[in-house]
UniProtKB/Swiss-Prot annotation:
Function: Catalyzes the reversible interconversion of serine and glycine with tetrahydrofolate (THF) serving as the one-carbon carrier. This reaction serves as the major source of one-carbon groups required for the biosynthesis of purines, thymidylate, methionine, and other important biomolecules. Also exhibits THF-independent aldolase activity toward beta-hydroxyamino acids, producing glycine and aldehydes, via a retro-aldol mechanism.
GO biological process: one example: tetrahydrofolate interconversion
Name by which UniProt lists this protein: Serine hydroxymethyltransferase
Phylogenetic lineage: Bacteria, Bacillati, Actinomycetota, Actinomycetes, Mycobacteriales
Family: Belongs to the SHMT family.
Site description Plays an important role in substrate specificity, residues in chain: 290
Amino acid sequence: MAADPSSNSSSVPAANGADYADTASAAYQAALQVIESVEPRVAAATRKELADQRDSLKLIASENYASPAVLLTMGTWFSDKYAEGTIGHRFYAGCQNVDTVESVAAEHARELFGAPYAYVQPHSGIDANLVAFWAILATRVEAPELANFGAKHINDLSEADWETLRNKLGNQRLLGMSLDAGGHLTHGFRPNISGKMFHQRSYGTNPETGFLDYDAVAAAAREFKPLVLVAGYSAYPRRVNFAKMREIADEVGATLMVDMAHFAGLVAGKVFTGDEDPVPHAHVTTTTTHKSLRGPRGGMVLATEEYAPAVDKGCPMVLGGPLSHVMAAKAVALAEARQPAFQQYAQQVADNAQALADGFVKRDAGLVTGGTDNHIVLLDVTSFGLTGRQAESALLDAGIVTNRNSIPADPNGAWYTSGVRLGTPALTSRGFGADDFDRVAELIVEVLANTQPEGTSKAKYKLADGTAERVHAASSELLSANPLYPGLTL
């Protein structure tokens, strides 16, 4: 058994790496020398990427800064090992060390989130969602049909019975949050594979307030009768009552699947508790391991005992060989998240988002729902006469990295959009506090107030002379006061 990090009274090493900068510097300098000897362009781009990240206000809600411990864990010979299967049941010999790191990662995930079961193999959030979808289909559709046919395995079915099962698997219903309300492509939308798996319908938000309307969700569920009710979001700036979502799912006989990819760090950090913690209420919970959780890029599935056996068959159901080096990094990141300092970090993420929202409100900038109570602020840039694409580009000119995003009933569609999504996890990892985020709001408003559309184009814009330079200089002061990976020299 791995040691319980929650008993460790020391704080988590800062994500900026200050606690072991000399060691990390030596490791990266040596690594880059090796890379440079083989392909100098990659080494140069790696150095340039660090410089770019250090010199920009990163407000993309889905990005963060992993600790050097997490980053270094990914650069090992675990990358060389195939390990298809599950712990103790691999299709390859010699996987005992992979079994160890996968076991440690799963143990940390179970303890951190209070889940009966954790599956840490998915390579990404979409892989985690696909594993969850197919586990639900296997449990709710495939298993009963096999029993009806008197078969133990799909390979035992005749061609006719197999075709019957395939048709039934492909004829199920999913109800999820609409894209313009803040949902995600992987929640059953046509351009994504999930939209080709299910008959999908969407629920939205109250058109006047922008908040979830649980009565409307319940009405949609009663009418549509989905097999799967998906809760979770990528651009909704409020908390969700998952107890209510479970009540709705139970009423219509649906499986509640929660995608907490964006806010897993706030769950791990105990900012979201009770009805706002999805894990006790969902049948299946999916997440990424980066974003607010501050780990490596990857995915994870948590499940009740009912769904665990099907989720455990993620390979070969959806996945092939797991990325063993990334599973090892997940174990390190989850160990960090179990330490007390991560709870302080998560609370600061939420506090900083509130400060950012308040900074916009007092400067008369429009916000979807009028504010936030998670880590996301969704800025309605129509209040500046701009599209999301124009705003995103103008902000980038000034060294502020954001992403355009749809807002409810968006008149500019999903490409140009009318919103800009902002998130606080990354800059919080650098040490930014509430006063810093008020200043960030001021700088963003300064850029947008000095940006004008060019003609009728939804993409072209003109930024007033001197604005980009002035804002970039001001943001550089904030960044210098809160350095990224201080002491790390390349």
